Protein backbone atom coordinates (compact mmCIF):
# COMPACT_ATOMS: atom_id res chain seq x y z
CA UNK A 1 0.00 0.00 0.00
CA UNK A 2 2.82 2.34 0.98
CA UNK A 3 4.64 1.54 -2.27
CA UNK A 4 1.49 2.28 -4.27
CA UNK A 5 1.13 5.65 -2.58
CA UNK A 6 4.74 6.49 -3.30
CA UNK A 7 4.26 5.46 -6.94
CA UNK A 8 1.17 7.63 -7.31
CA UNK A 9 2.99 10.56 -5.70
CA UNK A 10 5.92 10.12 -8.05
CA UNK A 11 3.54 9.97 -11.02
CA UNK A 12 1.83 13.18 -9.90
CA UNK A 13 5.19 14.93 -9.55
CA UNK A 14 6.22 13.65 -12.98
CA UNK A 15 2.98 14.85 -14.58
CA UNK A 16 3.40 18.22 -12.87
CA UNK A 17 6.96 18.49 -14.21
CA UNK A 18 5.74 17.62 -17.70
CA UNK A 19 3.01 20.27 -17.49
CA UNK A 20 5.48 22.90 -16.23
CA UNK A 21 7.89 21.99 -19.01
CA UNK A 22 5.10 22.19 -21.59
CA UNK A 23 4.03 25.62 -20.34
CA UNK A 24 7.64 26.83 -20.32
CA UNK A 25 8.15 25.48 -23.83
CA UNK A 26 5.01 27.25 -24.99
CA UNK A 27 6.22 30.52 -23.50
CA UNK A 28 9.64 30.08 -25.12
CA UNK A 29 8.12 29.25 -28.51
CA UNK A 30 5.77 32.24 -28.29
CA UNK A 31 8.59 34.55 -27.22
CA UNK A 32 10.95 33.28 -29.90
CA UNK A 33 8.24 33.71 -32.53
CA UNK A 34 7.60 37.29 -31.39
CA UNK A 35 11.30 38.08 -31.35
CA UNK A 36 11.73 36.54 -34.78
CA UNK A 37 8.93 38.69 -36.19
CA UNK A 38 10.39 41.80 -34.55
CA UNK A 39 13.84 40.96 -35.90
CA UNK A 40 12.47 40.42 -39.41
CA UNK A 41 10.52 43.68 -39.23
CA UNK A 42 13.58 45.57 -38.00
CA UNK A 43 15.65 43.92 -40.72
CA UNK A 44 13.18 44.96 -43.39
CA UNK A 45 13.12 48.52 -42.04
CA UNK A 46 16.92 48.67 -41.93
CA UNK A 47 17.23 47.22 -45.43
CA UNK A 48 14.67 49.68 -46.77
CA UNK A 49 16.38 52.59 -45.02
CA UNK A 50 19.77 51.61 -46.42
CA UNK A 51 18.47 50.82 -49.92
CA UNK A 52 16.05 53.74 -50.14
CA UNK A 53 17.29 57.10 -51.20
CA UNK A 54 18.17 59.32 -54.10
CA UNK A 55 21.32 59.64 -56.17
CA UNK A 56 22.65 62.58 -58.16
CA UNK A 57 23.59 61.39 -61.64
CA UNK A 58 24.97 64.67 -63.01
CA UNK A 59 25.09 68.38 -62.28
CA UNK A 60 25.25 70.97 -65.08
CA UNK A 61 25.66 74.71 -64.82
CA UNK A 62 24.69 77.53 -67.15
CA UNK A 63 26.45 80.86 -67.77
CA UNK A 64 24.56 83.53 -69.67
CA UNK A 65 26.22 85.74 -72.26
CA UNK A 66 28.32 85.51 -75.40
CA UNK A 67 31.50 85.68 -73.28
CA UNK A 68 30.99 83.09 -70.51
CA UNK A 69 34.28 84.00 -68.83
CA UNK A 70 32.84 87.36 -67.84
CA UNK A 71 29.87 85.92 -65.93
CA UNK A 72 28.95 83.50 -63.15
CA UNK A 73 26.95 80.28 -63.14
CA UNK A 74 23.39 81.49 -62.68
CA UNK A 75 21.46 78.24 -63.10
CA UNK A 76 21.96 74.60 -62.17
CA UNK A 77 20.29 71.40 -63.34
CA UNK A 78 20.63 68.26 -61.22
CA UNK A 79 19.70 64.93 -62.79
CA UNK A 80 18.45 62.60 -60.06
CA UNK A 81 17.24 59.01 -59.84
CA UNK A 82 16.25 56.65 -56.99
CA UNK A 83 18.79 54.22 -55.55
CA UNK A 84 18.53 50.57 -56.54
CA UNK A 85 15.88 48.92 -54.37
CA UNK A 86 14.46 52.24 -53.27
CA UNK A 87 10.77 52.83 -52.80
CA UNK A 88 8.98 55.80 -54.30
CA UNK A 89 10.43 59.24 -53.53
CA UNK A 90 8.01 62.16 -53.49
CA UNK A 91 9.96 65.13 -54.84
CA UNK A 92 7.44 67.47 -53.23
CA UNK A 93 9.07 66.54 -49.90
CA UNK A 94 12.67 66.76 -51.11
CA UNK A 95 15.04 69.55 -50.10
CA UNK A 96 18.14 70.59 -52.05
CA UNK A 97 20.93 72.04 -49.91
CA UNK A 98 23.82 73.88 -51.58
CA UNK A 99 26.77 75.70 -50.00
CA UNK A 100 29.72 77.62 -51.43
CA UNK A 101 31.47 77.79 -48.06
CA UNK A 102 30.14 81.27 -47.32
CA UNK A 103 26.42 80.61 -47.33
CA UNK A 104 24.08 77.62 -47.42
CA UNK A 105 20.83 77.71 -49.40
CA UNK A 106 17.90 75.32 -48.99
CA UNK A 107 15.62 74.88 -52.01
CA UNK A 108 12.18 73.29 -51.92
CA UNK A 109 9.30 72.39 -54.21
CA UNK A 110 5.82 73.92 -54.07
CA UNK A 111 4.25 73.52 -50.60
CA UNK A 112 0.43 73.87 -50.37
CA UNK A 113 0.70 75.08 -46.78
CA UNK A 114 3.54 77.53 -47.31
CA UNK A 115 2.31 78.81 -50.67
CA UNK A 116 -1.48 78.72 -50.23
CA UNK A 117 -1.76 82.53 -50.20
CA UNK A 118 0.58 82.91 -53.14
CA UNK A 119 -0.18 83.13 -56.84
CA UNK A 120 2.37 80.40 -57.59
CA UNK A 121 1.00 76.95 -58.47
CA UNK A 122 2.84 73.61 -58.82
CA UNK A 123 1.83 73.42 -62.49
CA UNK A 124 3.92 76.54 -63.14
CA UNK A 125 7.20 74.85 -62.09
CA UNK A 126 6.58 71.32 -63.37
CA UNK A 127 7.22 70.24 -66.96
CA UNK A 128 6.53 67.03 -68.85
CA UNK A 129 7.39 66.71 -72.51
CA UNK A 130 10.31 66.71 -74.91
CA UNK A 131 13.33 68.73 -73.83
CA UNK A 132 15.14 70.41 -76.71
CA UNK A 133 17.21 72.55 -74.34
CA UNK A 134 16.93 72.20 -70.58
CA UNK A 135 18.44 75.68 -70.17
CA UNK A 136 16.13 77.33 -72.72
CA UNK A 137 15.60 80.81 -71.33
CA UNK A 138 18.52 82.98 -72.38
CA UNK A 139 16.42 85.38 -74.48
CA UNK A 140 14.60 86.37 -71.27
CA UNK A 141 17.62 86.33 -68.96
CA UNK A 142 16.50 88.99 -66.45
CA UNK A 143 19.55 90.67 -64.98
CA UNK A 144 17.71 93.90 -64.42
CA UNK A 145 14.25 94.75 -63.14
CA UNK A 146 11.57 95.27 -65.73
CA UNK A 147 12.71 92.74 -68.34
CA UNK A 148 9.79 90.47 -69.22
CA UNK A 149 8.99 87.87 -71.88
CA UNK A 150 7.63 89.25 -75.14
CA UNK A 151 3.92 90.02 -74.82
CA UNK A 152 3.97 89.51 -71.04
CA UNK A 153 1.94 92.08 -69.10
CA UNK A 154 3.29 92.36 -65.54
CA UNK A 155 0.36 94.58 -64.57
CA UNK A 156 -2.05 91.68 -64.95
CA UNK A 157 -0.05 88.61 -63.99
CA UNK A 158 3.40 87.70 -62.78
CA UNK A 159 3.68 84.04 -63.74
CA UNK A 160 3.40 82.27 -67.05
CA UNK A 161 0.35 80.08 -66.50
CA UNK A 162 -0.45 78.63 -69.92
CA UNK A 163 1.47 76.31 -72.25
CA UNK A 164 4.16 75.65 -69.66
CA UNK A 165 7.50 74.79 -71.25
CA UNK A 166 11.08 74.76 -69.97
CA UNK A 167 11.46 78.51 -70.47
CA UNK A 168 8.25 79.17 -68.53
CA UNK A 169 9.46 77.06 -65.60
CA UNK A 170 12.67 79.10 -65.41
CA UNK A 171 10.72 82.35 -65.58
CA UNK A 172 8.27 81.29 -62.87
CA UNK A 173 11.09 80.22 -60.55
CA UNK A 174 12.70 83.61 -61.12
CA UNK A 175 9.44 85.45 -60.41
CA UNK A 176 8.83 83.49 -57.21
CA UNK A 177 12.12 84.70 -55.75
CA UNK A 178 12.34 88.24 -57.10
CA UNK A 179 9.78 90.91 -56.42
CA UNK A 180 8.11 90.99 -59.82
CA UNK A 181 4.69 90.79 -58.18
CA UNK A 182 2.56 93.21 -56.14
CA UNK A 183 1.69 90.26 -53.89
CA UNK A 184 4.18 90.25 -51.01
CA UNK A 185 3.47 86.53 -50.58
CA UNK A 186 5.24 86.00 -53.92
CA UNK A 187 8.64 87.25 -52.85
CA UNK A 188 11.73 85.39 -51.70
CA UNK A 189 10.46 81.88 -52.45
CA UNK A 190 13.52 79.73 -53.12
CA UNK A 191 11.92 76.98 -55.19
CA UNK A 192 13.22 74.36 -57.57
CA UNK A 193 11.44 73.23 -60.70
CA UNK A 194 11.07 69.72 -62.09
CA UNK A 195 11.42 68.52 -65.67
CA UNK A 196 10.55 64.89 -66.34
CA UNK A 197 13.34 63.12 -68.24
CA UNK A 198 12.37 59.44 -67.92
CA UNK A 199 9.17 58.12 -66.39
CA UNK A 200 8.02 54.61 -67.34
CA UNK A 201 5.12 54.44 -64.89
CA UNK A 202 4.04 58.11 -65.10
CA UNK A 203 4.71 58.57 -61.37
CA UNK A 204 6.39 61.90 -62.13
CA UNK A 205 3.40 63.24 -64.04
CA UNK A 206 1.65 64.54 -60.94
CA UNK A 207 2.44 68.22 -60.50
CA UNK A 208 1.44 68.13 -56.82
CA UNK A 209 3.38 64.99 -55.88
CA UNK A 210 5.90 64.08 -58.61
CA UNK A 211 7.43 60.81 -57.40
CA UNK A 212 10.59 59.02 -58.47
CA UNK A 213 10.23 55.27 -58.87
CA UNK A 214 12.62 52.63 -60.19
CA UNK A 215 14.21 53.71 -63.47
CA UNK A 216 12.88 57.28 -63.35
CA UNK A 217 15.06 60.32 -63.99
CA UNK A 218 14.10 63.90 -63.17
CA UNK A 219 15.87 67.18 -63.78
CA UNK A 220 15.84 69.50 -60.77
CA UNK A 221 16.06 73.09 -62.00
CA UNK A 222 17.26 75.91 -59.78
CA UNK A 223 18.62 79.45 -59.87
CA UNK A 224 21.70 80.41 -57.86
CA UNK A 225 20.11 83.60 -56.47
CA UNK A 226 21.39 83.23 -52.87
CA UNK A 227 25.00 83.28 -54.04
CA UNK A 228 25.22 87.02 -54.35
CA UNK A 229 27.76 89.20 -52.57
CA UNK A 230 25.47 92.23 -52.22
CA UNK A 231 22.09 90.47 -51.90
CA UNK A 232 20.81 92.14 -55.05
CA UNK A 233 20.28 89.57 -57.84
CA UNK A 234 19.29 92.30 -60.28
CA UNK A 235 22.92 93.40 -60.72
CA UNK A 236 24.35 89.90 -61.00
CA UNK A 237 24.67 86.75 -58.92
CA UNK A 238 25.84 83.15 -59.16
CA UNK A 239 28.83 80.87 -58.69
CA UNK A 240 32.15 82.36 -59.82
CA UNK A 241 35.11 80.31 -61.12
CA UNK A 242 37.13 78.11 -58.73
CA UNK A 243 34.28 77.82 -56.21
CA UNK A 244 34.02 74.70 -54.06
CA UNK A 245 30.37 73.66 -53.89
CA UNK A 246 28.95 71.00 -51.58
CA UNK A 247 25.44 69.92 -50.74
CA UNK A 248 22.80 67.22 -50.75
CA UNK A 249 19.50 66.27 -52.29
CA UNK A 250 17.61 65.17 -49.18
CA UNK A 251 14.51 62.94 -49.48
CA UNK A 252 11.94 62.54 -46.73
CA UNK A 253 13.28 59.04 -46.02
CA UNK A 254 16.45 57.26 -47.04
CA UNK A 255 19.91 58.36 -48.09
CA UNK A 256 20.49 61.74 -49.68
CA UNK A 257 22.21 62.35 -52.99
CA UNK A 258 25.63 63.99 -52.75
CA UNK A 259 26.56 67.27 -54.46
CA UNK A 260 30.31 67.89 -54.52
CA UNK A 261 32.20 69.79 -57.20
CA UNK A 262 34.52 72.71 -57.85
CA UNK A 263 33.66 75.13 -60.62
CA UNK A 264 36.32 75.44 -63.37
CA UNK A 265 39.04 78.08 -63.06
CA UNK A 266 37.73 79.70 -66.25
CA UNK A 267 34.39 79.47 -68.00
CA UNK A 268 34.78 78.79 -71.71
CA UNK A 269 31.30 77.44 -72.55
CA UNK A 270 27.77 78.42 -71.64
CA UNK A 271 26.92 74.92 -70.39
CA UNK A 272 29.37 73.13 -68.08
CA UNK A 273 29.33 69.61 -66.68
CA UNK A 274 30.15 70.12 -63.01
CA UNK A 275 29.56 66.66 -61.55
Swiss-Prot record:
<dbReference type="InterPro" id="IPR002774">
    <property type="entry name" value="Flagellin_arc"/>
</dbReference>
<dbReference type="Pfam" id="PF01917">
    <property type="entry name" value="Arch_flagellin"/>
</dbReference>
<keyword id="KW-0974">Archaeal flagellum</keyword>
<dbReference type="InterPro" id="IPR013373">
    <property type="entry name" value="Flagellin/pilin_N_arc"/>
</dbReference>
<dbReference type="GO" id="GO:0005198">
    <property type="term" value="F:structural molecule activity"/>
</dbReference>
<dbReference type="GO" id="GO:0097588">
    <property type="term" value="P:archaeal or bacterial-type flagellum-dependent cell motility"/>
</dbReference>
<protein>
    <recommendedName>
        <fullName>Flagellin B5</fullName>
    </recommendedName>
</protein>
<feature type="propeptide">
    <location>
        <begin position="1"/>
        <end position="4"/>
    </location>
</feature>
<comment type="function">
    <text>Flagellin is the subunit protein which polymerizes to form the filaments of archaeal flagella.</text>
</comment>
<dbReference type="GO" id="GO:0097589">
    <property type="term" value="C:archaeal-type flagellum"/>
</dbReference>
<comment type="similarity">
    <text>Belongs to the archaeal flagellin family.</text>
</comment>
Amino acid sequence: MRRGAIGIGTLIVFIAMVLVAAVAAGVLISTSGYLQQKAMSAGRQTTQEVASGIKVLNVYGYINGSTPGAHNITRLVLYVSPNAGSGGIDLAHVKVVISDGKRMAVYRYYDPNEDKNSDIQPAYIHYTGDIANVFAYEKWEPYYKGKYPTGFDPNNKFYITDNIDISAVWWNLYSAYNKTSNNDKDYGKLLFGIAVVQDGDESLDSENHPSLSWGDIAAIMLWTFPFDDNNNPIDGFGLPPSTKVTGKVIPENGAGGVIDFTTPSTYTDNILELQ
